[in-house]
């Protein structure tokens, strides 16, 4: 049997896996495209995103471990809280390919709204199991509100732009 820290570490690191896959869309051409877009003055510098997302993914991953542990593993009771978590995480991981890969700012905004709703539902479900796990999601919910607002502003201010060229209306 594995030492108790192994599942804790696995759950904590798991959310970052999708981040690594999605990050390939945030390099090279995707970044050049993004650099050419109109952005509000309050948008964060690029170097902030790695530490912020790394911290948020680690917190939500550890929270999922707390829920898993409290419910005795992948039991019937864990289906809703861990299912909601998995769903919001998949939606979260879909954002970089939608925004940077397909350059679909409007659909990326829809994705973020879905992520936010699923993350809020996850927080409520987790609170019933482990208030600490739910509290670990609070910074994530705040960041989602910020990034959703940022995505909206970028979409609004660049409506009709794709790849540096104006699209026909």
UniProtKB/Swiss-Prot annotation:
The chain crosses the membrane at residues 6-26, 47-67, 80-100, 106-126, 135-155. It is found in: Mitochondrion membrane. GO terms for molecular function: androgen binding; benzodiazepine receptor activity; cholesterol binding; cholesterol transfer activity; transmembrane transporter binding. It comes from the Eukaryota. The keyword Membrane applies. Residues 2-5, 68-79, 127-134 are mitochondrial intermembrane. Keywords: Lipid transport, Membrane, Mitochondrion, Receptor, Transmembrane, Transmembrane helix, Transport. One of its GO terms (biological process) is glial cell migration. Residues 27-46, 101-105, 156-169 are cytoplasmic. The keyword Coiled coil does not apply. Disulfide bonds: none annotated. Found in many tissue types. Expressed at the highest levels under normal conditions in tissues that synthesize steroids. GO terms for cellular component: cytosol; extracellular exosome; intracellular membrane-bounded organelle; membrane; mitochondrial outer membrane; mitochondrion. Its main location: mitochondrion. It is a multi-pass membrane protein. PANTHER family: PERIPHERAL-TYPE BENZODIAZEPINE RECEPTOR (PTHR10057), TRANSLOCATOR PROTEIN (PTHR10057:SF5). Belongs to the TspO/BZRP family. Can bind protoporphyrin IX and may play a role in the transport of porphyrins and heme. Promotes the transport of cholesterol across mitochondrial membranes and may play a role in lipid metabolism, but its precise physiological role is controversial. It is apparently not required for steroid hormone biosynthesis. Was initially identified as peripheral-type benzodiazepine receptor; can also bind isoquinoline carboxamides. Interacts with TSPOAP1. May interact with STAR. Interacts with MOST-1. Interacts with TMEM97. Forms a complex with TMEM97 and PGRMC1; the interaction occurs in MIA PaCa-2 cells but not in MCF7 cells. This is Translocator protein. It comes from Homo sapiens (Human). The gene is TSPO.
């Amino acid at each position: 049997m594995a030492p108790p820290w192994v599942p804790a570490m696995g759950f904590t690191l798991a959310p970052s896996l999708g981040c690594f896959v999605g990050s390939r869309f945030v390099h090279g051409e995707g970044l050049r495209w993004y650099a050419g877009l109109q952005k509000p003055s309050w948008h964060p510098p690029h170097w902030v995103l790695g530490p912020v997302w790394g911290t948020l993914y680690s917190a939500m991953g550890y929270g999922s471990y707390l829920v898993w542990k409290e419910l005795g593993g992948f039991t019937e009771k864990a289906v809703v809280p861990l299912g909601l978590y998995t769903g919001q995480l998949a939606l979260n991981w879909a954002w970089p390919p939608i925004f940077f890969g397909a350059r679909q700012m409007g659909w990326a905004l829809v994705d973020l709204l879905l992520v936010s709703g699923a993350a809020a539902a996850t927080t409520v479900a987790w609170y019933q199991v482990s208030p600490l796990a739910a509290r670990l999601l609070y910074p994530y919910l705040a960041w989602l509100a910020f990034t959703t607002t940022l995505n909206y502003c970028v979409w609004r201010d660049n409506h009709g732009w794709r790849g540096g060229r104006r699209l026909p209306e």
